[in-house]
Amino acid sequence: MSKHTYNRNIEITHHAMQRLEERVKNYKGFKSWQELVRTARYKGRSEQNMTDAEYQWYSTHITNLHSSSQVRIMNGFAYLFMGNKGHARTLVTVIQVA
């Protein structure tokens, strides 16, 4: 019986978000959440960066994540998603946690 917890979606609480921020800030090379957003990669969009409009939106909302935000842990990386009231979640950033 294999466990697939690495594939599990985890709803983010305010406390969990703080812990994730702490972990990111302790990560070598950390600059800022805005820098992480600026260099975020979209799943299915190859190595393409966010557009300027997308970056502007996320840079103003990244410090005010809400209950629809999620982290998906997979293969040693934390994928941070954001979503609004039923809208599709969008990949914001990827953080190595292993």
Short names for language-model regions:
Residues 1-98:
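Ribonuclease/tRNase effector modules and their secretory precursors
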